[in-house]
């Protein structure tokens, strides 16, 4: 089947839905985790911190390794890593001590989410705009996080009511279907430009010398704290 840039846009939009799943699903299980696994409130707070810190670390570290591969490869990897983390969240706590199992899962899906942050924006910006500004396309893509967040919270909450809190592990399995599907899509969709070549004129050290970057980093830290 012939793909066009509409399929690429849809894959980018769905990538932000994946991010919404990764960030918002586990907190819906906090009460369940306390009841079933007897985890502490400090552990749940640490889990939120791990999710945020890993995403920030991947955002920064990607400046180094993104030069050694392609955006397609990273897009596929980000989706499958997110899916793997969600699958492990459903399976690992049943097979080993729950606290390290949940942390391992969070490390994986947070890595995938952080990598998506780095990859999806350049991808959507590179696509032909068909008369619309690239800023409008970027804003639309980011709006899919909000739609995804609303869907994750609503569907998961209703599902927990229907199937019972003891069957919570079915939900990560269900939501993992989205990044699995999207990872497969990213293996097929066309890229607008040759994205094997990247500008590395600033480098990681150069970024930290820019006041704008430090300001945005501070805002992201504050946003993570508010979560």
Predicted regions mapped to residue ranges:
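Cytoplasmic helix-loop-helix junction between adjacent transmembrane helices
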Residues: 105-143
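Helix-loop-helix hairpin linking two adjacent transmembrane segments in secondary transporters
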Residues: 140-194
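Short hydrophobic/small-residue motifs within alpha-helical transmembrane segments
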Residues: 51-53, 146-147, 220
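Primarily marks hydrophobic transmembrane alpha-helices of the MFS/SLC 12-helix fold
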Residues: 72-75, 79
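Central cavity-lining transmembrane alpha-helices of secondary-active solute carriers
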Residues: 46-64
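C-terminal ends and interior cores of transmembrane alpha-helices
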Residues: 80-96
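Juxtamembrane intracellular "pre-TM" segments in multi-pass secondary transporters
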Residues: 1-4, 193-216
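Pair of pore-lining "gating" transmembrane helices in MFS-fold secondary transporters
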Residues: 2-29, 107, 211-227
């Amino acid at each position: 089947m012939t793909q066009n840039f509409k399929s690429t846009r849809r894959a980018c939009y769905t990538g932000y839905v994946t991010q919404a799943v990764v960030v918002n699903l586990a907190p819906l299980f906090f009460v369940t985790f306390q009841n079933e696994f007897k985890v502490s409130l400090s552990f749940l707070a640490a889990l939120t911190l791990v999710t945020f810190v890993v995403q920030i670390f991947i955002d920064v570290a990607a400046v180094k390794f993104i030069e050694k591969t392609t955006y397609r490869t990273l897009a596929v990897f980000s989706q499958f890593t997110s899916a793997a983390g969600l699958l492990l969240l459903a399976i690992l706590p049943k097979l080993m001590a729950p606290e390290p199992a949940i942390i391992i899962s969070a490390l994986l899906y947070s890595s995938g989410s952080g990598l998506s942050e780095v990859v999806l924006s350049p991808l959507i910006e590179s696509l032909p705009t068909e008369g619309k500004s690239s800023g409008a396309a970027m804003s639309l893509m980011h709006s899919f996080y909000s739609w995804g967040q609303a869907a994750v919270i609503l569907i998961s909450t209703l599902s927990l009511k229907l199937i019972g809190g003891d069957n919570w592990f079915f939900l990560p399995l269900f939501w993992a279907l989205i990044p699995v599907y999207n990872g497969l899509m990213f293996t097929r969709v066309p890229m607008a430009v040759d994205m094997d070549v990247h500008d590395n004129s600033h480098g990681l050290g150069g970024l930290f010398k820019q006041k704008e970057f430090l300001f945005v980093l501070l805002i992201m830290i504050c946003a993570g704290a508010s979560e």
